[in-house]
């Protein structure tokens, strides 16, 4: 029997990089709500006492960047200088300019269907039947832990919690099947007046046990709860944060490859985002159709060109039909041109701020998680 361990991590909405992602996507959503055809590339930097919002935007919309930023930080929970960051007193600097006309001429077309890709690049999508949401288990449960931390912080169950937190889960596999959880790391920012023993008990009983399936925990499972012993200074005071620095947390926790392009702050004409969503949609439908147990899709683009420069499929030996057949089915059932995938997934609307914490995939409220093509794929594959 082949045994191996696999680890994925996640971070909470109060992590500095995630604050930046959420501000960038809040700006994107506010612009798309007024102007669905806007071109947006919004980057954010956060550090003690300040937020810098920059990037390139071409739009007819007007949004109050400062108020939007403060509202986002407030909703995350940084509302007092004791935390090292305060939504009402931090400085907000706006350095947004216009998109280069050189890019515009390569992307825009008289016929919208021939819209070119906003940049070159390669994107991956992945799905696996090891969970019911067709996502890898390690990242799924890493997200669930920090999501639970946020819930019990906000509802007052554990009032000493603060917004910044990180999780990490190591799963044990035999012959690529989960046999248990080997290790759990959960570090959470907290107020200075909570004793370490009380914190460990609260996290174990209120966050870890309700989230992780008991059948995967055993006497050998290792728990690391705030292993440094103290985590009072966190958020932007502890570390500066930048948009796009949590691309593995945002996707598959390292279980699949990544093309390198971040998502947050980018409108759907940016294939870094829209094609990665479409690739997840394709991979998930292939697995939902029973054509493979695991599936990774790669697509690539040239700037200003509508058709993908390549489409490839990898099923890791789990495919029920050949990968050549799968590629043919992908081309037949999915329009992966920039305009086509925006239309296919209805992406030109304000749905992005919710993606910017706890993962972009495995959450059924998003259109790229639908499995509406599975039956047709299965039928055309002859299964």
Swiss-Prot record:
<dbReference type="Pfam" id="PF00438">
    <property type="entry name" value="S-AdoMet_synt_N"/>
</dbReference>
<feature type="binding site">
    <location>
        <position position="239"/>
    </location>
    <ligand>
        <name>L-methionine</name>
    </ligand>
</feature>
<feature type="binding site">
    <location>
        <position position="17"/>
    </location>
    <ligand>
        <name>Mg(2+)</name>
    </ligand>
</feature>
<dbReference type="InterPro" id="IPR002133">
    <property type="entry name" value="S-AdoMet_synthetase"/>
</dbReference>
<comment type="subunit">
    <text>Homotetramer; dimer of dimers.</text>
</comment>
<keyword id="KW-0479">Metal-binding</keyword>
<dbReference type="Pfam" id="PF02773">
    <property type="entry name" value="S-AdoMet_synt_C"/>
</dbReference>
<feature type="binding site">
    <location>
        <position position="266"/>
    </location>
    <ligand>
        <name>ATP</name>
    </ligand>
</feature>
<dbReference type="Pfam" id="PF02772">
    <property type="entry name" value="S-AdoMet_synt_M"/>
</dbReference>
<feature type="binding site" description="in other chain">
    <location>
        <position position="270"/>
    </location>
    <ligand>
        <name>L-methionine</name>
    </ligand>
</feature>
<feature type="binding site" description="in other chain">
    <location>
        <position position="15"/>
    </location>
    <ligand>
        <name>ATP</name>
    </ligand>
</feature>
<feature type="binding site" description="in other chain">
    <location>
        <position position="56"/>
    </location>
    <ligand>
        <name>L-methionine</name>
    </ligand>
</feature>
<dbReference type="GO" id="GO:0000287">
    <property type="term" value="F:magnesium ion binding"/>
</dbReference>
<feature type="binding site">
    <location>
        <position position="239"/>
    </location>
    <ligand>
        <name>ATP</name>
    </ligand>
</feature>
<feature type="binding site" description="in other chain">
    <location>
        <begin position="245"/>
        <end position="246"/>
    </location>
    <ligand>
        <name>ATP</name>
    </ligand>
</feature>
<keyword id="KW-0963">Cytoplasm</keyword>
<keyword id="KW-0554">One-carbon metabolism</keyword>
<keyword id="KW-0630">Potassium</keyword>
<feature type="binding site">
    <location>
        <position position="43"/>
    </location>
    <ligand>
        <name>K(+)</name>
    </ligand>
</feature>
<keyword id="KW-0067">ATP-binding</keyword>
<comment type="similarity">
    <text>Belongs to the AdoMet synthase family.</text>
</comment>
<dbReference type="GO" id="GO:0006556">
    <property type="term" value="P:S-adenosylmethionine biosynthetic process"/>
</dbReference>
<dbReference type="GO" id="GO:0005737">
    <property type="term" value="C:cytoplasm"/>
</dbReference>
<keyword id="KW-0547">Nucleotide-binding</keyword>
<feature type="region of interest" description="Flexible loop">
    <location>
        <begin position="99"/>
        <end position="109"/>
    </location>
</feature>
<dbReference type="GO" id="GO:0004478">
    <property type="term" value="F:methionine adenosyltransferase activity"/>
</dbReference>
<keyword id="KW-0460">Magnesium</keyword>
<feature type="binding site">
    <location>
        <position position="262"/>
    </location>
    <ligand>
        <name>ATP</name>
    </ligand>
</feature>
<feature type="binding site" description="in other chain">
    <location>
        <position position="99"/>
    </location>
    <ligand>
        <name>L-methionine</name>
    </ligand>
</feature>
<dbReference type="InterPro" id="IPR022628">
    <property type="entry name" value="S-AdoMet_synt_N"/>
</dbReference>
<feature type="binding site" description="in other chain">
    <location>
        <begin position="164"/>
        <end position="166"/>
    </location>
    <ligand>
        <name>ATP</name>
    </ligand>
</feature>
<comment type="function">
    <text>Catalyzes the formation of S-adenosylmethionine (AdoMet) from methionine and ATP. The overall synthetic reaction is composed of two sequential steps, AdoMet formation and the subsequent tripolyphosphate hydrolysis which occurs prior to release of AdoMet from the enzyme.</text>
</comment>
<keyword id="KW-0808">Transferase</keyword>
<dbReference type="GO" id="GO:0006730">
    <property type="term" value="P:one-carbon metabolic process"/>
</dbReference>
<dbReference type="InterPro" id="IPR022631">
    <property type="entry name" value="ADOMET_SYNTHASE_CS"/>
</dbReference>
<dbReference type="GO" id="GO:0005524">
    <property type="term" value="F:ATP binding"/>
</dbReference>
<comment type="pathway">
    <text>Amino-acid biosynthesis; S-adenosyl-L-methionine biosynthesis; S-adenosyl-L-methionine from L-methionine: step 1/1.</text>
</comment>
<dbReference type="InterPro" id="IPR022629">
    <property type="entry name" value="S-AdoMet_synt_central"/>
</dbReference>
<dbReference type="InterPro" id="IPR022630">
    <property type="entry name" value="S-AdoMet_synt_C"/>
</dbReference>
<dbReference type="InterPro" id="IPR022636">
    <property type="entry name" value="S-AdoMet_synthetase_sfam"/>
</dbReference>
<feature type="binding site" description="in other chain">
    <location>
        <begin position="230"/>
        <end position="231"/>
    </location>
    <ligand>
        <name>ATP</name>
    </ligand>
</feature>
<protein>
    <recommendedName>
        <fullName>S-adenosylmethionine synthase</fullName>
        <ecNumber>2.5.1.6</ecNumber>
    </recommendedName>
</protein>
